[in-house]
From Swiss-Prot:
InterPro entries for this protein: Amidohydro-rel, Metal-dep_hydrolase_composite, Metal_Hydrolase, Urease_alpha_N_dom, Urease_alpha_subunit, Urease_AS, Urease_asu, Urease_asu_c
Annotated protein name in UniProt: Urease subunit alpha
Manner of cofactor binding, per the entry note: Binds 2 nickel ions per subunit.
The keyword ATP-binding is assigned to this record: no
Protein source organism: Burkholderia mallei (strain ATCC 23344)
Length: 568
């Protein structure tokens, strides 16, 4: 006997299916389910009177043959597609994406459920890969709480705490500081990787930082980003398969942008805040977006361009870079970095895929908990102002959604050599997953899974008789406690450091994972974000022209994902 359900009734019971559309938060962005891996009439769902019961949707198979956890009937949003599926987790990793159930009595089962299987109900939820923020100033450890609660599960950057150097630059300088920060990483339920200071003109001071555990090096103008330092740093990176991130020379003291590009010598490099408000050759650092070896990113305070963007930047910059507003030269330095024309063009360059990544610049001209919010606010603003992208039709914004989700998931992972572990929802990868109610997508996750275990969730009064009574807010879960913390999060290091045995020498508890492939990745590898336009910035007007087209847009006066969701 066949029971026919209306689309509405089906969605209410099992979540959206093929052809159903979902609005992301209160934006104008709509995604459409492209494929449903579950089978109509054979869906599994947990609860009283539901399917996942012994002898029904639950099999008699032993623990070795079933998933540890299954997220049922979820909509996956990732760079590779937008699909409905069950997600299996085994030993802390994504084991399969497909159809869960009891293979003894159900057809098409690719994920076996047994007595050893926990269930997370994904009906009506969107699941994304954990976010990756690659521009972290480790000024305060409390940033990690904010980042994790926003859906970021990996943080890469440098620093030692609220030292003056760290307030301005993302560097963990020298072996002693590197060892201490790696030891501190053991105490936090998030994946971490640290960048050493890359500003040196001879190899030894840089190599010893890589040997101490740095996953890459950071060149920052406040330490002197000269052509000699750039060349030396990239040479060391090539020798050690690590990445280099750069904050270029705003004052053009050691050369203009052309001199910096020449110092790259065609070698791969990650350019931070490539628009320039966060720092970099004034006014035309944006030119580097057209280079095949440059992996460009933005930081979030300029995302998206609004009526308030310019006003807040001056004071922000003075504090972060230890400048004095009473000194004319310091004020001129600050003002040279804040240009409405290049900030407006940055919106469009993101929408067209010329800027490949988005990160925070945490507490140093950036908000650590707003990477994901501001990514989707930019996508919304561009849809409203520019209409559908070429890859989208009238029904959905699937291509735009894939382009923007890639900016804070897979592309940062590829850039920093960690895509073999994190950055997407694919079998074999570490199970860092973020679950969202569509109405709160990008703003407030419902649950964050780290290494297959729930790390943070919205939870009600612990003294209540059920989990939901107020006050409901983010609380750390069992993955953040005791020995589970070290077994559900990763610390990324260089292969040199791993081979040198730093885990035992430093007494580290977390799993150490070496970065790899950092020197072979190019702009062409940036998924959905590989456009290499020829960019010209007018030195007088700051107008930005890409492949002959003037890039300009109006600032937004109102944004979604904002005051509707927050009291403060």
């Amino acid at each position: 006997m066949t029971l026919r359900l209306s689309r509405r009734a089906y969605a209410e019971m099992y979540g959206p299916t093929t052809g159903d559309r979902i609005r992301l938060a209160d934006t104008e962005l709509l995604i459409e389910v492209e494929r449903d891996h579950t089978l109509y009439g054979e869906e599994v769902k947990f609860g009283g009177g539901k399917v996942i019961r012994d002898g029904m949707g639950q099999s008699q198979l032993p623990a070795a043959d079933v998933a540890d956890t299954v997220i049922t009937n979820a909509v996956i949003l990732d760079h590779w597609g937008i699909v409905k599926a069950d997600i299996a987790i085994k030993h802390g990793r994504i084991a399969a994406i497909g159809k869960a159930g009891n293979p003894d009595i159900q057809p098409g089962v690719t994920i076996a459920i047994g007595a050893a299987t926990e269930i997370i109900a994904g009906e009506g939820l969107i699941v994304t890969a954990g976010g990756i923020d690659t521009h972290i100033h480790f000024i305060s450890p409390q940033q990690i709480d904010e980042a994790l609660a926003s859906g970021v599960t990996t943080m890469i950057g440098g620093g030692t705490g609220p030292a003056t150097g760290t307030n301005a630059t993302t560097c963990t300088p020298g072996p002693w500081h590197m060892e201490r920060m790696l030891q501190a990483a053991d105490g936090w339920p998030i994946n971490l990787g640290f960048l050493g200071k890359g500003n040196a003109s001879r190899p030894q001071p840089l190599v010893e930082q890589i040997e101490a555990g740095a996953i890459g090096l950071k060149l920052h103008e406040d330490w002197g980003t000269t052509p000699a330092a750039i060349d030396n740093c990239l040479t060391v990176a090539d020798d050690t398969d690590t990445q280099v991130a750069i904050h270029t020379d705003t004052l053009n003291e050691a050369g203009f942008v052309e001199a910096t590009v020449a110092a790259f010598k065609g070698r791969t490099i990650h350019t931070y805040h490539t628009e320039g408000a966060g720092g970099g050759h004034a006014p035309d650092i944006l030119k580097v977006c057209g280079e095949a070896n440059v992996l460009p990113s933005s930081t979030n305070p300029t995302r998206p361009y609004t009526i308030n963007t310019l006003d807040e930047h001056l004071d922000m910059l003075m504090v972060c870079h230890h400048l004095d507003p009473s000194i004319a030269e310091d004020l001129a330095f600050a003002e040279s970095r804040i240009r409405r024309e290049t900030i407006a063009a940055e919106d469009i360059l993101h929408d067209l895929g010329a800027l490949s990544m988005l990160s925070s610049d945490s507490q140093a001209m950036g908000r650590v908990g707003e990477v994901i919010i501001r990514t989707w606010q930019t996508a919304h603003k561009m849809k409203v102002q520019r209409g559908a992208l070429a890859g989208d039709g009238a029904r959905n914004d699937n291509f735009r959604a894939k382009r923007y989700v890639a900016k804070y998931t897979i592309n940062p992972a590829l850039t920093h050599g960690i895509a073999h572990e994190v950055g997407s929802i694919e079998p074999g990868k570490w199970a860092d997953l973020v679950l969202w109610e569509p109405a709160f997508f990008g703003v407030k996750p419902a649950m964050i899974v780290k290494g297959g275990m729930i790390a943070v969730a919205q939870m009600g009064d612990p003294n209540a008789s059920i989990p939901t009574p107020q006050p409901v807010h983010y609380r750390e879960m069992f993955a953040t406690r005791g020995g589970a913390l070290a077994r559900t999060s990763l610390t990324f290091v260089s292969q040199l450091a791993l081979d040198a045995g730093i885990g035992a020498r430093y007494g580290l508890a977390k799993r150490l994972v070496p970065v790899r492939g950092c020197r072979t990745v190019t702009k062409r590898d940036m998924i959905h974000n590989a456009w290499q336009p020829a960019i010209r910035v007018d030195p007088e007007t700051y107008d930005v022209v890409a492949d002959g087209a003037l890039l300009t847009c109006e600032p937004a006066a109102v944004l979604p994902m904002a005051q509707r969701y927050f009291l403060f």
